[in-house]
């Protein structure tokens, strides 16, 4: 799936997604956060903005330092250190805590609903050939 999204802020996001393509860039392979998948250490997502870019999940923040962003200026990465844990174990522990009433859900039903609305909007836009507003 390839899609372009315009956000409320005016930012434009370009997304290319596949759960079928064989590659080292799958989220679980990149993070190595579970022993179920062999770690490649490759980034699966890149966020690029006017002043900086972020590789994810390796968390290298690329920027021009104190200089104005420009192709002629040196751009350097600053690593952001983060210790990863087994995501599946953390998710099930959190789910159990939510069920027991010890903590609120990190992702709410409203978040899930919006994810579904967005997914359905992508399918509608692709099948109908027009932009879908959310």
Regions found by a protein language model. Give the residues of each.
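A short, polar/proline- and glycine-enriched secondary-structure boundary/capping micro-motif
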Residues: 24-29, 65-71
């Amino acid at each position: 799936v390839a899609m372009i999204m315009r956000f409320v802020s005016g930012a434009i996001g370009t997304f290319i997604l596949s759960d079928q393509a064989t590659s080292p860039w799958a989220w679980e392979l990149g993070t190595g956060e579970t022993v179920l998948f062999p770690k490649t250490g490759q980034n699966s997502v890149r966020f690029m903005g006017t002043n900086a870019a972020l590789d994810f999940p390796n968390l290298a923040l690329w920027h021009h330092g104190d200089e104005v962003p420009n192709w002629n200026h040196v751009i350097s990465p600053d690593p952001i250190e983060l210790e990863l844990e087994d995501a599946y174990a953390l998710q099930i522990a959190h789910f159990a805590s939510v069920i027991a009433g010890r903590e609120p859900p990190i992702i709410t039903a409203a978040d899930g609903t919006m994810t579904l609305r967005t997914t359905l909007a992508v399918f509608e836009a692709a099948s109908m050939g027009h932009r879908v507003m959310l």
